């Protein structure tokens, strides 16, 4: 099995909250797709609660588009990481990390403005695969955590696992 890019960085050294360009690629038509690692929690030390991350998934996708789309950027998808420490965001374009961080903070402010769980988009059995597994309160606690901290930039070159370590790990 090929080694995925996300497993070549040292998770023990990742800061959070932080933005990291996880990958860039060109489409056959020459568009640049950028994948961002939006790290909400320090890996192996913190984790977002499942109901909160699920609710945040519903809210974050729309709010980030409100604040980041335009000026050569269009979000394709925002999805939670299975480890529940962050989200991956794929988009067309190459925005600066600070622009992404600013949009992230603005989106978290929007999450705090949601006043009722019934206002969560697509919160029904027809549009959500686990529509009972939500918590606006937990999503707002996650958002507040981001707003209470600086969003920094994680750089791949600073987090790269040495080849010797990858070999030691049998990768």
Swiss-Prot record:
Q: Does the keyword Iron apply?
A: yes
Keyword annotations from UniProtKB, A to Z: Autoinducer synthesis, Iron, Lyase, Metal-binding, Quorum sensing
BP term (GO), one = quorum sensing
Chain sites annotated for binding Fe cation: 54, 58, 128
KW Ligase (keyword) present: no
Q: Give cofactor(s), names only.
A: Fe cation
Q: InterPro entries, per this entry?
A: LuxS_sf, Metalloenz_LuxS/M16, S-ribosylhomocysteinase
Q: Which GO terms describe its molecular function?
A: iron ion binding; S-ribosylhomocysteine lyase activity
According to UniProt, the reaction catalysed is: S-(5-deoxy-D-ribos-5-yl)-L-homocysteine = (S)-4,5-dihydroxypentane-2,3-dione + L-homocysteine
Q: What is its EC number?
A: 4.4.1.21
| Annotated cofactor note | Binds 1 Fe cation per subunit.
Q: What role does this protein play?
A: Involved in the synthesis of autoinducer 2 (AI-2) which is secreted by bacteria and is used to communicate both the cell density and the metabolic potential of the environment. The regulation of gene expression in response to changes in cell density is called quorum sensing. Catalyzes the transformation of S-ribosylhomocysteine (RHC) to homocysteine (HC) and 4,5-dihydroxy-2,3-pentadione (DPD).
Q: How does it assemble?
A: Homodimer.
Q: Which family does it belong to?
A: Belongs to the LuxS family.
Q: What protein am I looking at?
A: S-ribosylhomocysteine lyase
Species this chain originates from: Serratia proteamaculans (strain 568)
- Taxonomic placement: Bacteria, Pseudomonadati, Pseudomonadota, Gammaproteobacteria, Enterobacterales
């Amino acid at each position: 099995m090929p080694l995925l890019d996300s497993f070549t960085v040292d998770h023990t050294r990742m800061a959070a909250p932080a933005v990291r360009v996880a990958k860039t690629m060109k489409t056959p038509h020459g568009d640049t797709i950028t994948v961002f690692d939006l790290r909400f929690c320090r890996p192996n030390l913190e984790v977002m609660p499942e109901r909160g991350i699920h609710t945040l998934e519903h809210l974050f996708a729309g709010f980030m588009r409100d604040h980041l789309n335009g000026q050569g950027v269009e979000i394709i998808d925002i999805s939670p990481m299975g480890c529940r420490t962050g989200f991956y965001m794929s988009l067309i374009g190459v925005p600066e990390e600070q622009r992404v961080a600013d949009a992230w903070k603005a989106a978290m402010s929007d999450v705090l403005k949601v006043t009722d769980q019934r206002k969560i988009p697509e919160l029904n059995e027809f549009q959500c695969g686990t529509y009972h597994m939500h918590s606006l309160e937990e999503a707002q606690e996650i958002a507040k955590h981001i707003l209470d901290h600086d969003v920094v930039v994680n750089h791949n070159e600073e987090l790269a696992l040495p080849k010797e370590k990858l070999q030691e790990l049998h990768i």
